[in-house]
Structures are given as C-alpha cells and as structure tokens.
Amino acid sequence: MKKYILFFLALSSTLNACGSPNGLGIEEPNAYVQAINIPVAGNTFQTAGPSTDAITSNGIASWTQTNTQYSLFFKTDKALRCRIQLIGTMDPSHTIRIKIGQTIRTLIPGTNGEIDAGEFSLSAGYQEVSLQGMSKKTANYATITDLRIEINEDISGISYVKDNVDNRFYWGRRGPSVHLTYTVPAGLNLKWMYNEVSIPLQMDPIGSYFMANGFGEGYFGMQVNSDTERRILFSVWSPYVTDNPASIPDDQKIKLVKKGPQVYTGEFGNEGAGGQSYLRYPWVAGKTYQFLNSVEPDSQGNTVYTAYFKEKEATEWLLIAQFLRPKTSTWYKRPHSFVENFDPLFGHITRKATYQNPWMVDSGGQWVELQEVKLTGDDIARRGYRLDYDGGVSNNQFFLQNGGFFNSSALLNSMSARPAQQQKPSIDFQKLP
C-alpha cells in the first residue's frame, strides 16, 4: 500500500511540472487584467549625457550616446505588483539596463514592438524608471514611445501626464506650478506689498521662477536663467489681451516711467504681453531678499506700478522699474506668490521658496500683516498629472515647493494660517529712489 501511495505522489508531481508551460515547474508571469501606456514624451527626462539625445514629442527617437540616461516617472497610490514593457524598437544585439527602485535588469526585445522588462513590486508613491545604454552595434540604442504597465489594480490609481492636448507634454515636463494667495482685509485701498524670500540650499535649479509679490496685473520675483545668470524680474501685463506684444495698440501699451541703473526694460509675450524689466543680479540660495512694490491709480484713468529690491542686510533699496498701465484704475489686488519652472529640461529637480514676512500697506499708511494663504495650482496640478507639489505653512513661514517627483499630501484649495509674527519692517517710503 505504501508503494502505491509513493508512486501516486511521484506521478502527481511529474504531471504538475509538465502542466506548467515550461515543463520545469517554473512559474510563468501573472496574467494581468488592466494595462496603461505612459507616454515617454510627457513623463521622461534626460538625467545624464549630452543634449544631442533629446526627448521629442514622440518620445525617445535618437539615442546614440552610451552615457545618456533617461528617467521616466509616474506615481502609484498604493503598493502593487505589475509587469512593465517598453513600446518601441530595439536591436536584439543591443544591451539596455532598466532600474526601478533597487531592481536592475537587462531589457529583452520582442517581435511585436514590445521590449520586456518583467515583473516588479512597487511601493506606494512616485516611481523612477531609469534606462541606461550599455552596448550597441548600430547608431541608435532604441526608439521608445511608451512605457506599458500591466496590473490587477484600478488604473486610476496611477498618476502621470496622460495626453498632449494643449501642449500638456511640455507643461507636464515643466512640472506643476503652485501659488499662495494671501488673505487680506476687505475695504482697504492697498498700495504696497512687502515680502522676504529665501531659497533653501540646493533648491534653486535652472528654470526656477520664485515669484515673491504678485498682483492682479503682473508679478515681481527672482529667476534662475542659466548656470551663470540670475535675474530680478518685474512685469506688468497690458490691458489688451494678447500673447503678441507687437499687436498691442499704442494707447494700451505699458509705458516706462523710470528704471534703476543696469535694469533692462522691454516687452514680453507668450503668456500674456506687456512691459518687462529685469536686473541681472547674482542672488544665492540661503540668503534672504526683500521685495517691495506698489500699485496706485493716478486719478487720470491709469495705474502706476513700482518695484524695489534689496538684500536683507543692505541699507539701500534698488529701484527696478516704474510702469504706467493705461485704461486701468486700481489699487493692489490679489496679492500672491508662486513657484514655477519655465524650462522643461529641469522639471525632475525640486525647487522651493520660503516667504517669511509678508505685509501690505494701505493708502493711508496702515500696515497689515498677512497671516493666511490659499494653495492653488495650474492645469497640470489640477488634473493630477503631476502631484509633486506642496505649500502652506512650515515653521511659521509660508512656503511653496514643486518638481522633483517627491511624495506630498498637499491639497489644492486648502487654507493655511500662522500666528502674527509682529515684525513690521521699517521703511521710509519718502526716501525710496
């Protein structure tokens, strides 16, 4: 009887092994019921290598350099098991390494435009999929249009830039812009806004615009324009709505009243149009800078806008510019700050600003400390295409942060407040240049 039992168990084991597709008892990949294709063009950055291997509107089309590395990012709302493939073409003789978390593998090209990477276990949060060319025999490592994820979960829990409607691949690679709108008392004719801005160390990549003092018709802040150039920027939109400054009628053009030494003034376009001024200034992360600007009607149907800037330790304010906006009669409306990235090559790097001591001054000289803000975001943030943003109050300071694919639980349209700091600035407005 014992021999029959042993024979039955051995036969059963053999049949089970033969019943597996490979006949060796090795488990085949899971069958997944949901799949999404993440467009490379809107979700990938070149994180190493020469700029000749740029990402196009169709994804990775020319990958010629061995030291080029690409990173694609997406976010999952929970841990999951998945299968990952790349959609594109790859010569079978080429070797490309893929890294997700701590898992590193070699890609296997298929015959149906699919390059298999295998199965992965992902934790909740942002994922980085890195691709590194190792060896090749032809000019191009691969062409890749999409990253395909197969899962057994609800695909709505995966966040990424989904489409290129209204040029969203471009805006998505720039990253989510976020804003703080300050709560102000009703019934006051607000004239001045004062703010103190500091950028934490290593939070100032190229493409950053740390806007300090925004108003209904323009903005005032500091930029990182290149490795060698930084600017203090002050702009006022024309009342004529257009993206082309050349189309603005003469009676609706922004007029320069005065400007500071070494300040450039001209016109700007693309995101509205109007008058622009900037001072090339080597500001640095880790220091605090002061911004002061005014909005005042001239009683003749125009409004005058003036901006001043200085380091906190300095004694003299620098005049940036004074503009006159025709066909406008308003005091300072909608005071706000924002952080944005204007260069899509650097949307994978985090930037952050702190706003430490914002105040308003009304037309009668009354100072009002700003203690409450509302966090809002641009189209990319509101759609949930990019969720790497934060803002509100931290350590009794207002702050904004975006880019870099960090995990955040910030909620758009949420309110944050801080107690009064009672650090009113000492400014002699009569002595301003």
Regions found by a protein language model. Name each.
Residues 23-282, 292-297, 301-433:
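Extracytoplasmic
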Residues 6-7, 18, 415, 430:
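Intrinsic disorder/low-complexity detector
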Residues 1-4:
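Positively charged n-region of N-terminal signal peptides that target proteins for export
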